[in-house]
């Protein structure tokens, strides 16, 4: 392994100059390494999309992943808490018939206190047979509330402490 030619601070300064839109980290291509998983979140979701009339994508970012899963059920809805991403997601997902709903995000899962709030998902009880969530904080009780009886919740989370 060769020594890096640039310091961490130089790399950080370079990264901060990159435009940040949606959930597109392509500027990191070739600059980071990840260990591959034995499973694919996208493929797990794709397998569950077949035959459901609606899906909720919590924290869609710029809608990049959800758009790659098209065709989508007619009742597909996405939420996004990061205000700059809402319009990016709408532009990407509206042509696919997806409504993007701005929300206030839940606290990080590891920071939630027992009995803290029901969350902020503006949907009636048992609205969705499938709820997907990639890297978005959530209140478990709120997911249970909006998930139809017998429905599926698929999530992919990351973090140093959980």
Language-model-detected regions and their locations in the chain:
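Conserved alpha-helix/loop element of class I SAM-dependent methyltransferases that forms part
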Residues: 20-27, 32-54, 64-68
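Conserved beta-strand signature within the Rossmann-like core of class I S-adenosyl-L-methionine
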Residues: 150-161
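Structural alpha-helical scaffold elements that stabilize or flank donor/cofactor-binding regions
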Residues: 48, 122-124
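A short glycine-rich, Lys/Arg-flanked "PGG" loop and its adjoining helix->strand segment in the class I
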Residues: 138-152
């Amino acid at each position: 392994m060769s020594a890096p030619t640039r310091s961490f601070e130089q790399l950080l300064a370079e990264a901060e100059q990159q435009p940040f839109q949606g959930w597109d980290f392509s500027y990191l291509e070739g600059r980071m390494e990840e260990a591959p998983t034995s499973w694919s979140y996208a493929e797990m979701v794709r397998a569950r999309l077949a035959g459901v009339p609606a899906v909720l994508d919590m924290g869609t970012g710029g809608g990049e992943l959800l758009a790659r899963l098209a065709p989508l059920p007619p009742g597909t809805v996405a939420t996004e808490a990061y205000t700059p991403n809402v319009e990016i997601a709408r532009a990407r997902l509206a042509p696919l018939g997806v409504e993007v709903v701005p929300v206030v995000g839940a606290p990080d899962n590891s920071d939630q206190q027992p009995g803290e709030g029901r969350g902020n998902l503006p949907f009636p009880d048992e609205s969705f047979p499938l709820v997907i969530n990639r890297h978005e904080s959530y209140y478990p009780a709120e997911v249970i509330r909006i998930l139809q009886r017998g429905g599926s919740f698929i999530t992919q989370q990351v973090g140093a402490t959980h």
